[in-house]
Amino acid sequence: MNPIQSFHCKLRGLATTLDSETARLLRALDGEDSDFEDSPGRILHDLHSEVQTLKDNVNALLDEARLENQESTRFKKATKILMEKNSADVRKLREFFQKYGYQARDKEDSGCEHRVNNSTPELAVCKDIQKAGVKELSDPCVPSGSVSEEPLRSPQLSDFGLQRYIISQVPANPPQTAASLKEERVAETPPAKDPSVQVLKTPRCALRMDDFECETPKLEHFGISEHTMCLNEDYTMGLKNMKNIKSSLLSGVSGEAIGTGPVTSDNSFAIPGPIIQQMEENDVEYVSSPLPPKFCTPGLKIPSTMDRTDLVSIDYPLSKPNSSSTDLEIKDCVPLILNSDECYQSFAEPPSSAITSCENFATPSPPKVTAIPEDILQMITKHSSNLASPLDVKVMPRRKGTRGAANKENW
């Protein structure tokens, strides 16, 4: 129902109510209605309030209708703009496709789709026409009215306005006939499988990593590196030469110790005699003791309290040489343990060393003032005016970039 019609109906009912109430009030004023209890002013106020609520409701309904009208108008405008854009895009696409030989279908072919008829034979004819059109589209070698007779071609630079970048003109492929196309299709189709021939499947290879063994040998470390390679070679040759020398000495003289000097031969090189040791665990105690560390402080001399020439070395009896050629004797090795009583007997009191001028840490002598600058002299004369400058002190000229003390507030 239209809100305006409902509003008029309510307004008509209100007018009739007002007429009846006005007549009743007039009768009450004349004294005809003795049972009237409410005052006429209250009734009039109620009527005015009802009319005001009705007006508010009508205004709200009108606002809602106006908003809906505006939204519908806005939707129509947006739809028109979108339709115009779509039509422009379709037009551009049609022009772009026409450059490559595309032609739009005729209206007569698509007329059967929009034609609505109640007869069944006509619908069957229309379906047959549609199926024929689909077959023509799928088969490009059969010419028809709906499909363009020109074959599709690849895009060229001339289509985009870039003719000057063409280097060489490639001749187009000659048009193929229907027979050649059929032969190519037959050649491309794979041969049919013969059901009588059974192809055996390749069995899967199961990987067993537990039973896998590496065929390459393991890499073992023989203790040969860039630091020990030359030493191993030298000492190996030395041991071979030492074996020959020792056997000759033992045969000539028995019980004599081998000399500590380097041994040479005609077909061998010099071997350091005092560094050869027996390769046994019991000979560890014959290792030479290291030298004590030396601490050096610049500008400070510490007198030495120990003289290494006074140390008394004690020679311990060495183990008897065995008859086997693999063992070697230790020669000229400093013993690891020394007798403490004999060591401290040779200690002497160190002589007192003279202290040089560099080592004297006394208070330095005060500097001698030979000249007083001019700015310092002005400050001294300002505080004590009776002070007379000595004759030997010369006033030096003011240096560049210095400021006087007289105008100190304006610095």
UniProtKB/Swiss-Prot annotation:
Biological role stated in the UniProt entry: Component of the SKA complex, a microtubule plus end-binding complex of the outer kinetochore that stabilizes spindle microtubule-kinetochore attachments, promotes alignment of chromosomes at the mitotic spindle equator (chromosome congression) and assists suppression of the spindle assembly checkpoint. Kinetochores, consisting of a centromere-associated inner segment and a microtubule-contacting outer segment, play a crucial role in chromosome segregation by mediating the physical connection between centromeric DNA and spindle microtubules.
Keyword Chaperone: no
Protein source organism: Mus musculus (Mouse)
One GO location term (cellular component): cytosol
Entry keywords, A to Z: Cell cycle, Cell division, Centromere, Chromosome, Cytoplasm, Cytoskeleton, Kinetochore, Microtubule, Mitosis, Phosphoprotein
Compartments, as annotated in UniProt: Cytoplasm, Cytoskeleton, Spindle; Chromosome, Centromere, Kinetochore; Cytoplasm, Cytoskeleton, Microtubule organizing center, Centrosome
Underlying gene: Ska3
GO molecular function: microtubule binding
GO biological process: attachment of mitotic spindle microtubules to kinetochore; cell division; establishment of meiotic spindle orientation; mitotic metaphase chromosome alignment; mitotic sister chromatid segregation; negative regulation of mitotic spindle assembly checkpoint signaling; regulation of microtubule polymerization or depolymerization; spindle assembly involved in female meiosis
Record protein name field: SKA complex subunit 3
Residue numbers bearing the Phosphoserine modification: 34, 119, 138, 154, 158, 289, 324, 352
